[in-house]
């Protein structure tokens, strides 16, 4: 059968010696606005205790660059990442500490411009799933954590969830 002889070929690897060495990838997401951009979140590097625990690298698959397009980091390993649909410059991360962080690629800083509080009203365990749902004019960020909570957030106000559902 001709189909059984089809093979996959490695076209390209995305690796940065400084930022992705000894880190496992925890999440991937393609940009809905810029299909050539791929966000990859990474866990901490045990061999580099002075480096940030959480990293999110934005790779450009269109150009043959050997370095990420953007480098973002935070104080906790990033377990999930997503591009903010309807906001082409915003990238969200769900952390091991239970926080959600927001990066903006227009700002000349690698740390989050906004983050959720460490609070019992929000997540208290790792955030493994993030998704922006809704329409251009009415949308929310949905987050799910191993604490059994699903939270709904406004991207304009990450100080507290708009709604929390206990899934247990």
Name each region found by the language model.
Residues 61-64, 105-108, 156-158:
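Short loop/turn segments that connect beta-strands within beta-propeller blades
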Residues 38-39, 91-92, 142:
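Structural core positions within WD40/WD-like beta-propeller blades
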Residues 115-153:
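Repeat-solenoid scaffold signature
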Residues 1-58, 111-117, 148, 152, ...:
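Acidic and/or Ser/Thr-rich intrinsically disordered tails and linkers
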Residues 30-35, 81-89, 130-139:
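Loop/turn segments within WD40 beta-propeller blades
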Residues 34, 52, 74, 87, ...:
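Short loop/turn segments that connect beta-strands within the blades of beta-propeller domains
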Residues 17-20, 71-74, 118-122:
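Surface loop/turn motifs at the tips and blade-to-blade linkers of beta-strand repeat domains
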